[in-house]
Amino acid sequence: MAGDEIKAALFLCALQNAVRHGGVPQAGAVIGMVMGAHPELRKQAKEVSAAAKDAIADVAALSPEERVTKLQSLSPEMFAALHEKHEKKKVLPDLEGAEHGVVMRFAPNPSGPLHIGHARAAALNDAYVKQYGGRYILRIEDTDPKRVDPEAYDMVKEDIAWMGLGITETVTQSERFPIYYDLCKQLIERGGAYVCTCENEHFKALKDAKKACPCRDQPVETALLLWEKMLNGGFKEGEASVRVKTDLLNPDPAMRDYPIFRILDAPLHPKIGDARVYPLMNFSVVADDHLLGVTHVIRGKDHIANTRRQRYIYDHFGWKVPVYRHYGRMGIEGVVLSTSQMHAGIDEGKYTGWDDIHLGTLRALARRGISPDAVKNAMIAIGIGDVDISFSWDNLYAENKKIVDPVANRYFFVPDPLEAKIAGASAHTAHAMLHPGHEEKGTRTLEFTGTVLIPRAEIFSVIVSSLNDISQGGDYESPQAKISSENVSPITSINEKKESVHSDNLPKLEGSLSSSLNDRKLVPRKYEPKREITMLRLKDLFNVNITWDGETPSFSYGGDSLADARAAKARIIQWLPAQSFVPCTLLTQDGEMKGACEPAVTTEVGKVVQFERIAFARIDAVTESGVRAYFTHT
């Protein structure tokens, strides 16, 4: 999108947001709406964010009456959408102590882009902040240099923008090391921590025996000197660490005097290359939750043990503990979620990038045409229960269908097409609706001049079904390269053309309809010559009779009457004029489907359309080979 188009889209979304909520539009919601409709703008996140501020300012300057009038005139569809009836959304359970507002946080590691697993915490926290009001903090937890990808900082923010989360502030932990160092000093002074110089194996043996190591009873002054020595480079990696004093009799060994600071010589942190003393997660999280005023923490129950560890630090400082809610584990199958596996796969060329549709990243979902609102709604529907579950892709697709079905334009896509001449048919013009629920969108025009492209599989299905009916249980025999005539021509190189092409340029190849069915035996040894087999309805055009003459199917005009087609229980199939189509490849997680689509599909790049009788698909690009589309769902 050009700059002016981005500004116009942002202004309309900001206008709709203001009219809907009766106030100043929220930047996160506006940006999320635009990026949800145009995921390709993720790469322009900074430009979009800057333009959003101007759009919001322009809308804020209008009176409520002016906003309504302007939205009605500029986008009647968006105004009408405000009054559409929606299903009642699932309500999340109340949070204890949230009556006066909340401060919540989403805290990912910058090891890669966000994936569907991150979306649960992100969406649940966002929903609660919107429900109760308050602040929503994005906290980049990058205190472990081994888990930092420099490119991930921007990717995480782009994914946050795509989701449309109402983030009010962003904090990066690597920028807060001086704060953590000062708090560690205070904790030592309070007698709540000490510097341990024991060898790891020796400390573990003592810990397992529920005994204190010699360092635990060191005077505060000694501990402070050792702490300064750590900061000044006086120890090598593994020679010293800071441990918090807990209960040595705790039945869980992992709770006994666990470390909160360690020394790492390598790798260097990309943002603070001179740092060698690193806070561990359980310390930096407590420090930030307290200093940032976090009131409620929603996270997975795999963090229950961390919650117990962190309470020791809260108690040492005398700080108020946030309200914790731990939800059950969510198993996700069918996609790759491991950042290390994704990294390796991209480096090896196994995946095309972070948005490869075999991955579980949010940007992969966006490329497939999944709406951010669908992701959020699916996660809110799952809720914060503590029972372990398996993530349902079908539920996500159902949520997405609610969003895309009312707006996606309809087109014909003919997979693995056959070119068929329709005997006895005069020229016809088909007028197919762009969307059955929006007459105002108008129609697509398809001109029939004698020859059409039809799906090969449909003809197989019809012929097999009909021959089964007339075979009387006889054996089947493959015609082996005999189903080829002036009426039926297999098209095997459809992707050689990138624009509308004519049938005169298509190869007339010898072949068999049965060849794509692994030599499936289609023709009965006993058949009735010139027997009418069945009727098909070419959608929005006319009826076609298929007859079987020996081993060759023939197609003839069967009239315009839709009533006749219904009476004959004719299958309604998609088609294309043989003289006007664009090659199209529909990519799925299992492979690809090559075929042809309407030329108008080339105007839908970046949008989700419905290929009638096939699936919803996001039009990704138009290349020299034709249209590239990604399967969304059925």
Swiss-Prot record:
It catalyses: tRNA(Glu) + L-glutamate + ATP = L-glutamyl-tRNA(Glu) + AMP + diphosphate. PROSITE patterns: AA_TRNA_LIGASE_I. GO terms for cellular component: cytosol; protein-containing complex. Keywords: Aminoacyl-tRNA synthetase, ATP-binding, Cytoplasm, Ligase, Nucleotide-binding, Protein biosynthesis. It is found in: Cytoplasm. SUPFAM superfamilies: Nucleotidylyl transferase, Ribosomal protein L25-like. GO terms for biological process: amide biosynthetic process; glutamyl-tRNA aminoacylation. Pfam families: tRNA-synt_1c, tRNA-synt_1c_C, tRNA-synt_1c_C2. A motif ('HIGH' region) lies at residues 108-118. GO terms for molecular function: ATP binding; glutamate-tRNA ligase activity. Its EC number is 6.1.1.17. Catalyzes the attachment of glutamate to tRNA(Glu) in a two-step reaction: glutamate is first activated by ATP to form Glu-AMP and then transferred to the acceptor end of tRNA(Glu). Belongs to the class-I aminoacyl-tRNA synthetase family. Glutamate--tRNA ligase type 2 subfamily. PANTHER family: GLUTAMATE--TRNA LIGASE, GLUTAMINE-TRNA LIGASE. This is Glutamate--tRNA ligase. It comes from Methanoregula boonei (strain DSM 21154 / JCM 14090 / 6A8).
